[in-house]
Structure formats: structure tokens, C-alpha cells
Amino acid sequence: MRSETDVVVIGAGMGGLAAAIGAAAAGLRVTVVEAGDAPGGKARAVPTPGGPADTGPTVLTMRHVLDALFAACGTRAEEHLTLIPLPRLARHFWPDGSSLDLFTDTEANIEAIRAFAGDKEAAAFRRFDHLTTGLWEAFHRSVIAAPKPDLWRIAAATVTRPQLWPALRPGLTMRDLLAHHFKDPRLAQLFGRYATYVGGRPGATPAVLSLIWQAEVQGVWAIREGMHGVAAALARVAEAKGVRFHYGAKAKRIVRKEGRVTAVEIETGVSIPCGACIFNGDPGALRDGLLGDAARASMEKSPRPAPSLSAWVWAFGATPIGVDLAHHNVFFTADPELEFGPIGAGEMPEEPTLYICAQDREMQAPVPEIERFEIIMNGPAGHQPFPQEEAQCRARTFPMLAAMGLTFSPDPETRALTTPALLSRRFPGSLGAIYGGSPEGTLATFRRPLARTGLKGLYLAGGGTHPGAGVPMALTSGTHAARALLADRISAAK
């Protein structure tokens, strides 16, 4: 392994890749150690008869974040990936046989909702869209893009916008806000679904996070190479900038000497001297002492949050039979409480809502006979398997889809299923949560760990770190970590 290294990045997830690129672009010598056999972290794929199927994130928004990383390496995303803009955000289905497509175009959405639920609900959507636009404008620069949530900037951005104040009331949830806007429960259910995009339940997630709608409506892209292909492309351009990657290299300990990071030890016994370390993993791994006492002590002032949602994920190849699928699809339960009630109690949902990514649809290419699918059923975090887990999950997934007109041939095999317990083992310290800490609670956004820790030279990146979950957020966290590291080096040199 590299003996002359300025920075060791632990983990080649999206946050780690962005951090490595940011540090290397500034001229630092960077080594990435990754326990797995490929980059991507949660953005991974499994082999199927139809080709590699994503079994992690599938939605790419805020594309400017990705573009900036390729630009830092002197290239363009289009030279490495086939990025396809999707005019249709998703196709939504309900048990009563109704369905609704939503788009990136506001007027198209208004007309679709008018045909779906009538003039009053179309007008309600226009008001909701206007409100969330204002929330996005107020919170994007002051929270999402900022290295630390800036209360003064939030106040300055909202004090002159009284129309936003009701959505900022402490204790008001997304479910409350949406019930005020929409009389049709299907629309309240649909837009409440965005709470799950950051790992929360709509009945407990702050109303302000309704702004997530704007992250999608501003643009969604499909990637022909898959989300795992995005990670592979970022790793390639990072290597071209001089970053060295070591796969199958599990970090064992972050070494402290004289109050700062001096090395990272690998389980094989190799020690990599360095001046700084960026940890791209769940912060819970540090709190649990999995990287040594020095790393654990660095998190003493950062209390462990409640975990976000986990999921049961099917990834497989098959031929679909029945309803016409888009790239992104949501099959809703008739009663959201039969989903979120059990999840809140730590149980598998009785009647889940199911997200399906039909990875070969809307890709500007013929749809193959064997298509690739990812099906996500939200669930509670936890490291222990559920009783009869595979059978229970199968029974609550495919009969529901069949009742709504969708079947697959052949049925997915057991090995196609990823469980919360498996996610917990794969991502130490996470308890199987796939969105970091829970977004539920008024102050959850302000309690996420920031890039700097209590140990000089140790920084954090990833979905468990500010600004939170999702591919663009994880990438942003990596950029924050690299910038914090560089700023500290400049300060120390003065």
C-alpha cells in the first residue's frame, strides 16, 4: 500500500469518493481503503440474467453536484456516463385501480392532478408547489449546501416570507401539512411518501421537509450504467487524479498520537501513515469503538440519533406481466397506517407501499425480454432477523402486486432479497438504517454530525453526516469534508 499519503479515506461510498476527489484536486496524496470489492457503498449491484441490477439508491437529482465532481477532475459526466433526463418523475398506483403520473413540468402536473382528482385538488397542488419552492429557496443554501446549518441565514431567508411560517411551526409534521393542503387522501399519501426518501415517516417528519418534492421536480436522471456505474465512474476519474484505491482492505483502527490522526491500520496489519483521515461510513461505527478508542472519543459530543428507516430490497431479473411500468413506480397501500404503524413499532409492515425501479424502462433503448428490477419495502432498522423473514416479506410483496395487476416470471429467488439485518452487517454501526440518523423530530437536521470531529485530522463523510441521506447529499458531505480538511491544513500552516 501507498506509504506516502496525506489523506486516507476509509470507505469508497459516494461520500468517500467525493472527499477523495476534493482532496486530490487540491494536490493532496490520497489513499482510499474499502472493505468491499468495488466502490459505491450502498450503491451496489447484484448479477441477474438481465445484467447487473442496482440494489441501492436509484434516483439521481441535483445533478449539478455530480457535475462539479467530474469538473474537478477536468472532465464531464457525459464522457463517462449515459445520463437520461426523465420528464416523468414516477407512475403511482392505488388498490382502487387509479393511477397518476407526475412530471418535472409544473403545468403538466396540474393538468394530471386535475384529471385525477378535480379542479380543487389541482389548485391545492399549485399552492403546495409554490410553498415547497419557497422552502427550497430558503433552506437550500442555508442548510443543504452549507457545511453547517446556518440559523442566521435561515432566519434571514424566512423572516420576510410569512407564507412559509406555518410550515416551520415546531411539531408540525408532513402529514399535518399535507392534510391541510389536500382533501384527496391519495395525494396526501403520495406527497407524504417523500418523507421516506430521507428515512422518515410522514406522521413524524417535520413539515419543512416537504421541500424534498422540489429536489425531484427540478430534475431526475436515469443512468444507463446504473447507480453503481456512477460510483465506478467517479472512482476512475479519481484514479486519474492520482487517488489510489485498495479494495478488500478493512480499516481496523484510526491511530492518534499527540492529539491528532497519524495513521490508519488495516486488518491485515498494515499501517498507513497519514496526516488526516476521512471516515466514509456510519458514524455509529466510530461511536461503537469499531475503529479504536481514539475514534470513539472523537464522537463523545455527538450523541447517537435514532436510526432512520431500513428496507427489504429485492433485486432481480424477470419478465413483467400486466400493468405498464415507468422507470420509477410506486404501488400504494390503501391505508398508510397499516404501513407506518407497524414500522414505528419495530415490525414488518402489514400492508406496505412498494417502490419499483424498472431499470430498463425509459432508457431511450428497446426494453429487453428479461428486465432488471429493484423493489423496496420500507421497514424498521434492526440487526436481528425477523421470524420467517423471507417468507413473510415475499407474502407481503408479490401477492399485493398481483392484486394490482403486476406479476413477474420467474419469481425472484431468495438470494435476491436484502434484509435490514444483512444491511446492518454490511454497514457496521448502522443498525441496518439506510438513511443515517432519523429525520424525525423538529431539531433532527441540526443534530447530524458535521464534517469535523473531536479529533484533529479526523473528518466524516456519508449519508449519516450533514446534510443527510441521498446520493447528492452524500456527495455534498464528501465535498464538505475535503474542504474542512483543506481549511484546517491552511490554518495550521499559518
Swiss-Prot record:
SUPFAM superfamilies: FAD/NAD(P)-binding domain (SSF51905). NCBIfam families: carotdesatCrtDProt, crtI_fam. InterPro entries: Amino_oxidase, carotdesatCrtD, Carotenoid/retinoid_OxRdtase, FAD/NAD-bd_sf, Phytoene_DH_bac_CS. Its EC number is 1.3.99.27. It comes from the Bacteria. Belongs to the carotenoid/retinoid oxidoreductase family. It catalyses: rhodopin + A = (3E)-3,4-didehydrorhodopin + AH2. PANTHER family: 4,4'-DIAPONEUROSPORENE OXYGENASE, PHYTOENE DESATURASE. GO terms for biological process: carotenoid biosynthetic process; chlorophyll biosynthetic process; photosynthesis. This is Hydroxyneurosporene desaturase. GO terms for molecular function: oxidoreductase activity, acting on the CH-CH group of donors. Keywords: Carotenoid biosynthesis, Chlorophyll biosynthesis, Oxidoreductase, Photosynthesis. Pathway: Carotenoid biosynthesis; spheroidene biosynthesis. Gene3D superfamilies: FAD/NAD(P)-binding domain. It holds the Pfam family Amino_oxidase. It is an enzyme of class 1 (oxidoreductase).
